[in-house]
Amino acid sequence: MPVRWREPVNIKAPVSGDVRVDGPFEALIVLLEEWPDLRGSGYVRARSMCRAAVAGHKDAEDARKIFVVAAKEAKLLH
């Protein structure tokens, strides 16, 4: 069963529109398929943290924090 965050992150994805992201696995999908800038430092850090959280090597809530920072940087956060 995928790890879920205590609180979801709602973003406005360029392709899918409004997206509710409930955990690091869903965040990885958004990062890999929907992200507007694949070179930004926030993107790279969020991708790395979410991968590590999915693998059980990092805390999922820490990955959420990094994902939120990246979403703000990319101007995707609601």
Regions found by a protein language model. Give the residues of each.
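Short, compact, well-ordered microdomains
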Residues: 51-78
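A short, structured beta-strand/loop element
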Residues: 15-46
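Generic secondary-structure microfeatures
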Residues: 13-15, 71
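Generic preference for hydrophobic/aromatic residues in regular secondary structure cores
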Residues: 9-10, 19, 66
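Short, functionally important structural connectors and interaction interfaces within domains
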Residues: 1-3, 30, 68
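Short, charged/polar N-terminal "headpieces" of proteins
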Residues: 1-11
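A short linear-motif detector with a strong N-terminal bias
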Residues: 9-10, 33, 55
